Amino acid sequence: QNIEVRHVKTYAANKAPSNSALGSITLEMSNSMVLLPKIPMKRRYFDERVGWFARGQTDYGLKDQRSKTVKYLDRYRLEVKDEDIEKFKRGELVEPKKQIVYYVDRATPKEWVPYIIQGVNDWQVAFEAAGFKNAIIGKMAPTAEEDPEYSPEDVRYSVIRYLASPIPNANGPHVSDPRSGEILESDI
């Protein structure tokens, strides 16, 4: 499904946080290459009235020899299980084919973990309004013993990471399928 590449790079740097004695900075980086879904989701046009992530693409194939930027919505693939389609049509809550799972970084202070997990799970109400139960869950990231394949750098896992910082904010970048806007992974 994916390839993970980790590497250490050293660059010339004259300003902090460089090593002033050597004039360099060394960074450990991780890159993921992921196989996209065989069947892309149907694209949905972005609506300015809805505050959400969008992807702009330039269409050069217009007949009048001009280009046009089109915005598409980035979103999760929430699909009804085949056996639950009739229930869904009747307005009953159903579980999606694939849950949205956010793993909480094991470096997170222990006293905060239950609240972070509850914060993720509090989104259940929004997904229930769309007809899905248990669509999103928060859980503690597995240990190496529990899942030797798990890595917070791996593009297959959405992670809420703890990074001590004096800056009081959070960031939520995500990886999405450029063909459809399907969110494949997100980190907070």
Model-predicted regions and their roles:
Residues 109-113:
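Alpha-helix N-cap/helix-initiation motif
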Residues 114-121, 125:
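Solvent-exposed, polar/charged alpha-helical surfaces in well-ordered, non-transmembrane soluble domains
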